[in-house]
Amino acid sequence: MTDQPPPSGSNPTPAPPPPGSSGGYEPSFAPSELGSAYPPPTAPPVGGSYPPPPPPGGSYPPPPPPGGSYPPPPPSTGAYAPPPPGPAIRSLPKEAYTFWVTRVLAYVIDNIPATVLLGIGMLIQTLTKQEACVTDITQYNVNQYCATQPTGIGMLAFWFAWLMATAYLVWNYGYRQGATGSSIGKTVMKFKVISEATGQPIGFGMSVVRQLAHFVDAVICCIGFLFPLWDSKRQTLADKIMTTVCLPI
């Protein structure tokens, strides 16, 4: 049976799909619209690879410093850098240091409160003493022996006064002089004790040690206290041990 052409008026044979089509429906948007929504990829640079995309939401953290070391961490909360040291006191003329007589007057003023407190304690102890007598009767004699002794109130008053005087001296020579450079007597006489190395007050602990070092001045018949009369820096032996000087305010 031979093929016959389709009769006139029947449906024509559908046209073949365009090349590259899988036979489905054509997209509902034009290629120009696709190109405006998604830009075509750029050609790879010479070398064959694309640069890395930027990180989402910001930039990469900076790389660590070379050598694998990192900067030291910041100081913890509440830490402060130490204050810069003051100027060193090394080469002043002798006249720039405090006179010996001025230092003696300051010492007297400093010790007046402690002397008054101890005097009150001793006075109460003396006024409250009581007398105790013992009688010795023999065949031929009657002997009586008497002695005075402090009462409990007198002893309590003396030791309380002694503690108060000691506390005053520690406060005056340790805390006050260590923090400001001047005890009460030195403030009245207008001079201060400072370190030769820093030019600053020496602090509570070193100020107490300096007072104890005056034992060296006293143990050689108090000659150490006379050193400021001829020393070029008018220092006592305790000052030389502690490297301190006295300067007018």
Curated annotation (Swiss-Prot):
One of its GO terms (cellular component) is plasma membrane. Residues 34-85 are annotated as: 5 X 10 AA tandem repeats of [PV]-G-G-S-Y-P-P-P-P-P. InterPro entries: Pra-immunoreactive, RDD. Residues 1-20, 38-87 have a biased composition (Pro residues). The keyword Transmembrane applies. Keywords: Cell membrane, Membrane, Repeat, Transmembrane, Transmembrane helix. This is Proline-rich antigen. It comes from Mycobacterium leprae (strain TN). Residues 101-156 are annotated as: 2 X 23 AA approximate repeats. Its N-terminus, which contains the proline-rich repeats, is highly immunoreactive. It comes from the Bacteria. It is found in: Cell membrane. The chain crosses the membrane at residues 104-124, 151-171, 212-232. Belongs to the mycobacterial Pra family. Residues 99-242 form the RDD domain. It is a multi-pass membrane protein.
